[in-house]
């Protein structure tokens, strides 16, 4: 894959074999790039071009996972929750006890309706989807240690939401060399293309053959 933004940087070659790093030394440009990237990852409007081939351009909002804060896992929680609900509805629609639960809910509704001193109605056509939504299933990564939680969250998101590229912001500021090596092994084993956007270089971690630098003298657009 390739990523380019004509305002800020030339083509960055992306693969699942070697993570790429984009260092933006100018704080104003750094802010501008992040704002533009986040906006395009949400509404697909902007100057970033992600392509799988010369003729196939990919939607950033559909295929790019942008993690601006590795301490916050809310960004894609709604999408993951919706996907989880759909999986449960599709795979457990014939589960034992389903009809009894739905019947009991309807019976409870009738009892309440008949006991009220008002003329009311209720949703009697309860579906299995309604029951699953009521149970409010969601992914819970709280039992994991910090980096294990990070890995599990990304792995789950890529599996269920079909992302093709992960973009992290200042990831290298939070890892030592050993942690970094283990994280890169994970991304390579999972075949997840990774672009790390950083505010400054990390000599002990950077691979100069996979490093793009927007120098501090660059004016922001």
Residue ranges and their predicted role:
Residues 1-86, 175:
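Glycine-rich P-loop/Walker A and Walker A-like loops and their local beta1-loop-alpha1 context
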Residues 24, 159-176:
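Conserved P-loop NTPase "ATPase switch" module shared by AAA+ and STAND
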Residues 27-30, 138-144, 170-176, 202-203:
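Short acidic, S/G/P-rich loop/turn micro-motifs used as interaction or catalytic elements
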Residues 105-145:
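Conserved P-loop NTPase mechanochemical-coupling segment
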Residues 135-166:
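A mid-sequence, solvent-exposed acidic-amphipathic segment
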Residues 173-191:
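Conserved Walker B catalytic segment
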Residues 187, 191-208:
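Sensor-1/coupling segment of RecA-like P-loop NTPase cores
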Residues 219-221:
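Conserved small/polar residues in nucleotide/adenosyl-binding loops
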